[in-house]
């Protein structure tokens, strides 16, 4: 069926059809033609509303420059479908599943619609198990669930993208299977950095693209809101193929889920809906639920989703992060205070949570160590006001010891990342869970009280911290002798 455009408002089009030929909601419409300069136009839109008088309102997934009233819009009769399967690995696709890198078209015989139902309740798998990330503070305090949903919460500039990139690197190498990464409304530079990092670490194999382990789907900041709103669904669809057809365990990375919400807010206003709290769309909960409920584990395979969540003005009660956190199994909250001290990853040990932090899941030893770290950190937080007003010397001997150990824990929580070697100047470290538990177990009772604080900073494990302390001592002695002779 062919309709014609009656109105264009930014990325939103009104299209009139003949009586009885109206497209369904979510059907894709294709507008083809030429602009006044003679350039070809090919715009795909998605039907969002049926207006009456045989008109529909659709949202464009690409720029509407050059479109004019009266141009024809073809109803494809189905929702947007994208290529899925092994041919997408090693490639960068856009929201339509079209490749945006150089190696040519994606040769796939299988396509899935991007709007799919969540698995039925009877298909879900409720098995509880953790997976190791190699990041000390995460594995100890807020372990991630295999087949769960995890959120990295943080304001602007506290370091969300670097941990996401590190996790892609660690999991793609250690996990060995395939993964899918969705760039939702983020910077083009970050997408390019991730692509280069993947090629460097051989997760994307340019020589033999079929051996690549990751599929990338990008809808970056400069895209229209229709593309940014649906790129998360495209990434989920690609991950669902590996879960349902190949029966694999698939990590799905989304950076950044708030851009999905913001795109929905832009579209909602253009569709004429009354805004809700803080200007967000009234359908925020429904839109978030329809995306998040598809990301789950079934008896056939699993999708483990790790999502970066931008927190506007560092306010975790903002409707967007608050709605997101309701769907998550673990939250890793990044602290601006820790980032200001140069402690990366700036994970807040007290705000970060996980449903897996239970003694019958992670084991008594792990649980007790994590609780000890949290108690020490909480006591340090309580004492900070007293220290700021009266100074450290006014504390009791016991409290001074607690503060010293808490500061050591804080610094030992920092870790050099493989993807951040150029920034830190230290080789990246993957730290196993037994090493992590051993390190914090030694700090808590005071076995490392003789080590200077700076020895724990950017150290992978206890052995490295001890070696750094010895090096610092030698350096200090050398400087001391130099001062005497000078």
From Swiss-Prot:
KW Manganese (keyword) present: no
Pfam families, A to Z: ATP-synt_ab, ATP-synt_ab_N, ATP-synt_VA_C
Entry keywords, A to Z: ATP synthesis, ATP-binding, CF(1), Chloroplast, Hydrogen ion transport, Ion transport, Membrane, Nucleotide-binding, Plastid, Thylakoid, Translocase, Transport
Q: Which reactions fall under this protein's catalytic activity? A: ATP + H2O + 4 H(+)(in) = ADP + phosphate + 5 H(+)(out)
Question: Function of this protein?
Answer: Produces ATP from ADP in the presence of a proton gradient across the membrane. The catalytic sites are hosted primarily by the beta subunits.
Query: What binding partners and quaternary form does the record give?
Result: F-type ATPases have 2 components, CF(1) - the catalytic core - and CF(0) - the membrane proton channel. CF(1) has five subunits: alpha(3), beta(3), gamma(1), delta(1), epsilon(1). CF(0) has four main subunits: a(1), b(1), b'(1) and c(9-12).
Q: Which HAMAP family does this chain map to?
A: ATP_synth_beta_bact (MF_01347)
Protein known as? ATP synthase subunit beta, chloroplastic
- Name the encoding gene, please: atpB
């Amino acid at each position: 069926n062919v309709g014609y455009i009656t109105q264009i408002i930014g990325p939103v089009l009104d299209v009139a059809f003949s009586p009885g030929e109206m497209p369904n909601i979510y059907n894709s419409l294709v507008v083809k033609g030429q602009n006044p300069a003679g350039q070809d136009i090919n715009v795909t839109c998605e039907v969002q509303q049926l207006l009456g008088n045989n008109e529909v309102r659709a949202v464009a997934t690409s720029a509407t420059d050059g479109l004019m009233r009266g141009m024809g819009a073809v109803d494809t009769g189905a929702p947007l479908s994208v290529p899925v399967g092994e041919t997408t690995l090693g490639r960068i696709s856009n929201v339509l599943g079209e490749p945006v890198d150089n190696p040519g078209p994606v040769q796939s015989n299988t396509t899935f619609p991007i709007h799919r139902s969540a698995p039925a309740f009877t298909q879900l798998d409720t098995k509880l198990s953790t997976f190791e990330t190699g990041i000390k503070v995460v594995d100890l305090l807020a372990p991630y669930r295999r087949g769960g949903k995890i959120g990295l919460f943080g304001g602007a500039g506290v370091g969300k993208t670097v941990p996401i990139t590190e996790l892609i690197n660690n999991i793609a190498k250690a996990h060995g299977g395939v993964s899918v990464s969705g760039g939702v409304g983020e910077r083009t530079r970050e997408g390019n950095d991730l692509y280069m990092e993947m090629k460097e670490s051989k997760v994307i194999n340019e020589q033999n693209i079929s051996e690549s382990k990751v599929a990338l789907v990008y809808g970056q900041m400069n895209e229209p809101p229709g593309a940014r709103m649906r790129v998360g669904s495209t990434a989920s669809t690609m991950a669902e193929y590996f879960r349902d057809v190949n029966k694999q365990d698939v990590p799905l990375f989304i950076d950044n889920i708030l851009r999905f919400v913001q795109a929905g807010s832009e579209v909602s206003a253009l569709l004429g809906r009354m805004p809700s709290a803080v200007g967000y769309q009234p359908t925020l909960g429904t839109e978030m639920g329809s995306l998040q409920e598809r990301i789950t584990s079934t008896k056939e395979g699993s999708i483990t989703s790790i999502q970066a969540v931008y927190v506007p003005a560092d306010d975790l009660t903002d409707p967007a992060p608050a709605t997101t956190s309701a769907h998550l199994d673990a939250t890793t909250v990044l602290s601006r205070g820790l980032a200001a001290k140069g402690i990366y990853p700036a994970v807040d040990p007290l705000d970060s949570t996980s449903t897996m932090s239970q003694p019958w899941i992670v084991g008594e030893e792990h649980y007790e160590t994590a609780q000890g770290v949290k108690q020490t950190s909480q006591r340090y937080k309580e004492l900070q006001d007293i220290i700021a007003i009266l100074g450290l010397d006014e504390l009791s001997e016991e409290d001074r010891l607690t503060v010293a150990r808490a500061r050591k824990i804080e610094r030992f929580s920092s870790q050099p990342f493989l993807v951040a070697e150029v920034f830190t100047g230290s080789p990246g470290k993957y730290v196993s869970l037994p090493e992590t538990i051993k390190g914090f177990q030694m700090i808590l009772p005071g076995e490392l009280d003789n080590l200077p604080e700076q020895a724990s900073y950017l150290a992978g494990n206890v052995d490295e911290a001890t070696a750094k302390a010895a090096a610092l001592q030698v350096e200090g002695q050398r400087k001391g002798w130099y001062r005497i002779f000078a």
